[in-house]
Amino acid sequence: MGVVIPEHKIQEVLERVDLVGLISRHVDLKKAGREWKACCPFHQEKTPSFYVVPEKRFYFCHGCRASGDAVSFVQRYLGKTFLDAVRDLARELGVDLEAEQDPSMRERQQIKEATDQAAEHFRAMLWQQDEGRSARAYIASRGVSDETAMAFGLGWAPLEWASLTERFQKLGMLEWAAKAGLVLKRNSGDGYYDFFRSRVMVPIRAPEGRPIAFGGRLIGADEGPKYLNSRESRLYNKSETLFGMDQSRDEIRKRKAAVLVEGYFDALGLHQVGVRHAVALCSTNLTAGHMQVLKRAEARELILLLDGDSAGLAAVERLSGPLLAAGATARVALLPQGDDPDTFARREGQEGVERLLEGAHPLTSHLFASLLPEGKAASFEEKMAALERLKPVVGQVPVGLVRATLFSAVAEHFGWRPADVEAALRSKVPLPKPAGGDAPPSSPNRPAPPLEKPPPALECFYVGAVLKEPRLMARDTFRVCDELSHMGLRMALAHATSGHGANDALFESSEAVKRGIESALRQLPSEPVPLEAAFLSICREIMVRRIDERLVYIKRATEQTPGAFDLTEETRQLLVERVELLALKKRVLEELKPASSGTKAPMQPV
């Protein structure tokens, strides 16, 4: 069975939970007749308008209209998903969820416990052992106080090969630690060794504060990458995790805004001076998953705090696609040359940072300034080059109002017409330069843009299966949804899973995407069991293909490598990645094995 919690179990949780007790942990409730009242935790107010009605098991705010039951309160206040909110409440109440018997859920719990043990081990190594002296000195040199270091749970992984391994061996948890990526099997196959060594450890926490992964900064050793992060697991998906969200959630909700930086220590430095609505990416680009996390924290605006050099401008370009695709309100604050958020915060303090944030400019203004500094005065060739760089950004924005507005803004900056901008961006062939001026020709005989490339059939089957049965997404334990290569399919999937349904998803899609999905829907089985079997087979095939493509690339990139002692750092990392990919492929083939009944996908698309 998939990870689907039976309805009667959810109802049991709602009936048994003490709603007043639950909410009073986070809100100062006062008795008011049969009800309880307080100032609303979801918006700022001076006069209480938030009421809890225990008899009816719901809460309601007369001010912002927030309302719901115990599960929705945990979701909204703690930033949890629906499934996690139900699980946490059930665990507290002792309700045995049938879904908890699923092997994937047992593994998730084992990884949680192993990660908790590792966090405690690293913390003790930093503060209670002489070995942690160099790490404490490094942390102090970064301007991080002991108080901040303790609040964020910083730790130390010593240089020894088996410091953490021995702890897990004594606890009988080595297998769990291996699943969490905290220890690795020796090449000889005999025993394990620590994944993190000689590193200042920064726990990456879920919104409720529990560690789910780690980032490690190399100290006092010259072997290995400067920064090393936990691999992804059933517990940790870097595309859906923002560092510091556990510390910043309340401030984000209060301000309705979040500050985004790209480094853990940047976020630490901002929090230390009082800018407590800052979060950081976990060594990945911004994704739709991150936007959902921010949405659950009620961030209506995102401010990018970036270096003022070429790297910062490149980051604006890189982050624009996901932000525009999500229709987010975003602004950009660029730091003075030579500063990063951490050093600037230490020198200027909260007041200086807040002043910089207040002066942040709209995202598109910075994007256009980066792509085409001269604006309308730029040459035709410069404008076409800027449009080429803009194509990947526009490709992430779905057809609709946001995309049309983007075309208009580009046209204004370029001094062109919106229709000409759209035609140039859709066409792979640059528009011809006009003889008499900078504006591109507007002849009605201009060739129509090429037809959209048809989406891959296998990916159409994946999206079609989810449209038929949205709960199948819970069976996507390998995050195949993140591997979809066709943006139109990704947008259709996002539209459907955000509550709009299959019909709306198809209505909003292009003709090519619509045809592909409709063809898949006709061929997919209708019955739940065969449909689930087909879905798992599709997931398996997509994952294996993606892994094989990457393995081929790594083979080509490393086959010309000289002797083992002459390996570059890049080659070493590729070889490590190859080992991890082979292990992942083995897991995929084992865990997504076709059902014994012989049920297969409706077809094997190429």
Curated annotation (Swiss-Prot):
The keyword Methyltransferase does not apply. Binds 1 zinc ion per monomer. A zinc finger (CHC2-type) spans 40-64. Its cofactor is Zn(2+); Mg(2+). GO terms for biological process: DNA replication, synthesis of primer. GO terms for cellular component: cytoplasm; DNA-directed RNA polymerase complex; primosome complex. Mg(2+) 2 binds at D307, D309. Pfam families: DNAG_N (PF08275), Toprim_2 (PF13155), Zn_ribbon_DnaG (PF01807). Residues 441-451 have a biased composition (Pro residues). Mg(2+) 1 binds at E262, D307. The keyword Transcription applies. Keywords: DNA replication, DNA-binding, DNA-directed RNA polymerase, Magnesium, Metal-binding, Nucleotidyltransferase, Primosome, Transcription, Transferase, Zinc, Zinc-finger. GO terms for molecular function: DNA binding; DNA-directed RNA polymerase activity; zinc ion binding. It catalyses: ssDNA + n NTP = ssDNA/pppN(pN)n-1 hybrid + (n-1) diphosphate. Residues 256-349 form the Toprim domain. It is an enzyme of class 2 (transferase). Its EC number is 2.7.7.101. Residues 429-451 are annotated as: Disordered. SUPFAM superfamilies: DNA primase core, Zinc beta-ribbon. NCBIfam families: dnaG. Contains an N-terminal zinc-binding domain, a central core domain that contains the primase activity, and a C-terminal DnaB-binding domain. RNA polymerase that catalyzes the synthesis of short RNA molecules used as primers for DNA polymerase during DNA replication. Monomer. Interacts with DnaB. HAMAP family: DNA_primase_DnaG. Belongs to the DnaG primase family. This is DNA primase. It comes from Myxococcus xanthus. The gene is dnaG.
